[in-house]
Amino acid sequence: MKFALPLLLALFMVGCASTKKKPFAAQRMTVRTTAYTHTEAGGVNNAIGSRLRFGGDTFSAASDWSWLPLGTRFRMVENGRTYVIEDYGSALVGRKTIDLYVPSMGEVRKWGVRNVDIEILEWGSKAMSLKLLKPRATRDYIQTMVAELQKTVPPSALAAATL
């Protein structure tokens, strides 16, 4: 009986001990990329109303949000730059293409179309993507993204989504 209390205490401590989480293993993939600039239709702001970014520690990118949702962060292997998905475009829907923001049409032409390796650093939010897109679903390409997102986003997640 005198060993019961220390044994119970030891079992309790082992049961409550936290396990170390394994470090996030970045998912690597090869993707088709194109480039766009602010002199095209969308202007200097991205889909969430912030300025498009080029330089610094994060660069702006666009995708089909039903594939790579808003907020997805990735690193391009060839140049080490970190990008965040914060925009979308009609030419991207259903094409598994990432459009990289660059500051000029000259840079758009220079980039062209390239297949590059990326590492996903953090997945964005499909629920937040859906929440932002639903009120904008007056165009076919946005309706397509909304329909795809609705297949995977439960209503409870949509209600809880915040930017």
Could you describe each region identified by the protein language model?
Residues 1-5:
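Positively charged n-region of N-terminal signal peptides that target proteins for export
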Residues 17-163:
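Solvent-exposed, well-ordered loop and adjacent helix/strand elements within mature globular domains
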